[in-house]
Design a protein with these regions (language model features):
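Short, low-complexity N-terminal intrinsically disordered segments enriched in polar/charged residues
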Residues: 2, 15-49, 148-154
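Sec-dependent N-terminal signal peptides
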Residues: 4-14
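Hydrophobic pocket/interface hotspot
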Residues: 35, 45-48, 54-55, 98, ...
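Short solvent-exposed beta->alpha transition segments
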Residues: 47-82
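Surface-exposed, charged secondary-structure patches
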Residues: 69-113
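A short acidic/glycine-rich loop-to-helix N-cap element
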Residues: 110-115, 144-150
Length: 154
């Protein structure tokens, strides 16, 4: 009986341990929320969120593969997007994958307004110089929603 109780306790602690977010998962999730809050306030993406090696990305517009550089500037005439249901998978101490949804309305500077922006996001993050940076991304419209109209960075 004593062994059975010990075995149950070990199994329960294993389940509880696997459900808790790791520090990496917490950091990446908070970074996504903080970067979005910055963009809501400043109508531009925060600088240096992309890896120094750049980021390969498929955008929600359905265009071709894009190569983004760390110094690429993205500005908006209107930005009211919100990240939801963020899940982060820790690959190792310096790599993580984030999956989440983004919804709201957005208008890139010089582009048309999208009042029904609704996409799925998958981003690969790497730890560089003490911070998490985007190394790859795939944005795709969710059924009933619309992606961006942009197909290239100017």
């Amino acid at each position: 009986m004593k062994n059975t109780i010990i075995l149950i306790a070990i199994c329960l602690s294993a389940v509880i341990t696997t459900k808790a977010e790791t520090e990496v998962e917490k950091e990446v999730k908070q970074l996504i929320l903080d970067n979005n809050a910055y963009t809501l306030k400043n109508l531009e993406f925060k600088g240096k969120t992309i890896s120094k090696k750049g980021s390969l990305e498929f955008w929600s517009s359905g265009g071709l593969l894009q190569s983004m550089q760390q110094n690429t500037k993205r500005e908006f005439d209107d930005y009211n997007l919100h990240s939801k249901h963020i899940k982060v998978i820790e690959i190792n101490a310096t790599t993580a994958v984030a999956l989440y949804y983004v919804e709201g309305n957005v208008q890139h500077k010089g582009s048309e307004n999208n009042a029904n922006y609704l996409t799925r996001v998958m981003q690969v993050y790497v730890k560089e110089e003490g911070g998490w940076k985007i190394r790859a991304a795939h944005w795709s419209p969710l059924t009933g929603g619309k992606g961006t109209t942009e197909t290239a960075v100017q």
